[in-house]
Amino acid sequence: MSLSSGLIAAVALAYMAVMFAIAFYGDRRSTPLPPRVRAWVYSLSLAVYCTSWTFFGAVGQAAEQLWSFLPIYLGPVLLLVFAPWVLQKMVMISKQENITSIADFIAALYGKSQSLAIVVALICLVGVLPYIALQLKGIVLGVNLLIGAGADATGTRAQDTALIVSLVLALFTIVFGTRNLDSTEHHRGMVLAIAFESLVKLFAFLAVGAFVTFGLYDGFDDLFNQAMLAPRLEQYWKETVNWPSMVVQTGVAMMAIICLPRQFHVTVVENIEPQDLRLAKWVFPAYLILAALFVVCAVIGVVTVIGWVVPSS
């Protein structure tokens, strides 16, 4: 079963129109959001951490080694639950020093060294460009699967898809993200749109997980019972966990939640009130746990039925 390119384009345009409308509303709103609503919006916006890699990379990685994807989710959960004071202190320093980026933050810790800020900014640029390319590859992969093309299909269609997505994202960033660099003026529209997108992603995660669990099987018991007997998954239950690698990757993920440029911006720069972290330290870990549950159900269910997975990179 495949969908027409026209239908996919129409749905994508409609979704982007909704995102633009939400961001526009957030920017033009004359009064601030109520404190409780603001805290929920901020908490959900932290799920910008979950990108297209969550859909494809984590599932592909888990298909190769079932629990190898866990550090990506476990690191942020451990940091927020057991050391939320780290983020609280970063937010306070950011507000005191009028910080607008991770480069400014690190430079501020060393006497506001401009040369250090430039070096950090260049490192972020070099690191982020391949990462953005990977996200675009994930989007193209999704489109290819929907239209019935091969997962690794290339050519004009794939190039056009990546180009169009890049232009739309650039336009959104220019309109709602880079109009000012004053740390006292928050991008309320952009954060509201990110929070909405986080809800959409969570709904998609749960919908796929529910379809696999209750559509292909008769619930969790049936899913895991059949998985235990499936020849394709026999090696999963015999694999040994590489604990040193798991610990190192979890530590890297803990740092990623505060060092990734987009994550730093949303978590630290866009924080309006530090007390919003009190809710975020529970909401965001719960979000990641639900996303991880989706990964496990999707991998076990789909591999058991058809033995097919998406590539991990």
What are these regions (language model features)?
Residues M19, P71-R179, S183, V248-A256, ...:
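Helix-loop-helix module between adjacent transmembrane segments
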Residues I147-T161, T213-A253:
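Helix-loop-helix junctions that connect adjacent transmembrane segments
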Residues A14-T31, Q65-I72, L109, A195, ...:
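Hydrophobic alpha-helical transmembrane segments
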Residues P35-T100, A107, K201, V212, ...:
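Membrane-interface helix-loop-helix modules in multi-pass membrane proteins
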Residues M1-G57, I164-M190, F196, L202:
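Membrane-interface "cap" regions at the ends of multi-pass membrane proteins
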Residues G6-Y15, A39-W40, P71-G75, L116-V120, ...:
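Alpha-helical transmembrane segments of integral membrane proteins
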Residues L116-V120, L129, V165, K201-A210, ...:
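Hydrophobic alpha-helical transmembrane segments in multi-pass membrane proteins
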Residues M1-G6, G60-L70, A149-D152:
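Helix-coil boundary and interhelical linker segments in multi-pass alpha-helical membrane proteins
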